[in-house]
Structures are given as structure tokens and as C-alpha cells.
Amino acid sequence: MRTLGVDLGRVRIGLAVADEILRTARAVTTVVRRTEAEDLAAIAEVARDYEVTRAVVGLPLNMDGTEGPSARLARGFAPRLEAALGVPVELFDERLSSFEAESRLRARGLSAREQRGQVDAEAAAVILQGWLDRRAP
């Protein structure tokens, strides 16, 4: 079974995939946002290519655990993504995922400019790995 990780941003959507047997998430691609229909179609194409059986969307909670506008955006997007993909979609707390993604990319020696195109997909991998780790026995 493969799971798709989604980091939903206002400009870009990061995507990652994990094989649940290997329990390791990896960044796949970044989708530049257009219309919601085009965004959903692009995500669905990746989901088909990787034969995913579920998806996890990052829920950007505030540090105190409350929900702001971005969290409401993710909550609204998740059911539409579920309908587009035809697989279950879960929300997962993504606090500090972008910070962790930037840290990982810096550790690989990428400059801020090089990170720009990869940070969203890496953040999706951070979210997905957190979800996998939480499910670990």
C-alpha cells in the first residue's frame, strides 16, 4: 500500500509518497497552483502513477493547537481531494514541517534559491513521515 503526502500551500502543493512496508516517505514533486480543478487533476495524476491507496494532507495548526485560515483551507480541500482521488484522505498536524524541510535541504547543501523548488515536496515528506511514525507499532 502506498500513501500520498500533501503539503497544501497557497502558491505550491508539495507531494510525497511512502510505501507502508518500507515506512519511509520521499519527496516526489511540487505542483504550482492554478485553479482547484487543475490542482486536483495534477495531484490525481501523481496518485495514479504511484498507485496510492490513501492520502494524508497536512493540517497547519497554530503553535497553540488552534486552527487559523490555512487550517480551514486544508479542511475544506481534503474532502474534495478524496472525491478526486477515490481514496481515503486524512488530515495530519503539520506544525513545523516547513522548518524541518528547510533544515533537511540546508543539510544537503542546497542554497535558499535551490530550496525554493523543493521545500514544498520535502515538507510533504516530513508530514507523511510523521504520519507513518505515529502509526508505528
Curated annotation (Swiss-Prot):
The subcellular location is: Cytoplasm
GO cellular component: a single term = cytosol
GO BP term, example: rRNA 5'-end processing
Q: Which SUPFAM superfamilies match?
A: Ribonuclease H-like
The EC code for this enzyme is 3.1.-.-
Asked if the Swiss-Prot or TrEMBL record annotates the protein with the keyword Zinc, the reply is no
Listed GO MF terms? nuclease activity
What is the main EC category here? hydrolase
**Sorted alphabetically, which keywords does the UniProt record give?**
Cytoplasm, Hydrolase, Nuclease, Ribosome biogenesis
Give one Pfam hit by family name: RuvX
Similarity comment? Belongs to the YqgF nuclease family.
The entry's function note states: Could be a nuclease involved in processing of the 5'-end of pre-16S rRNA.
Protein name as annotated: Putative pre-16S rRNA nuclease
Annotated source species: Anaeromyxobacter dehalogenans (strain 2CP-1 / ATCC BAA-258)
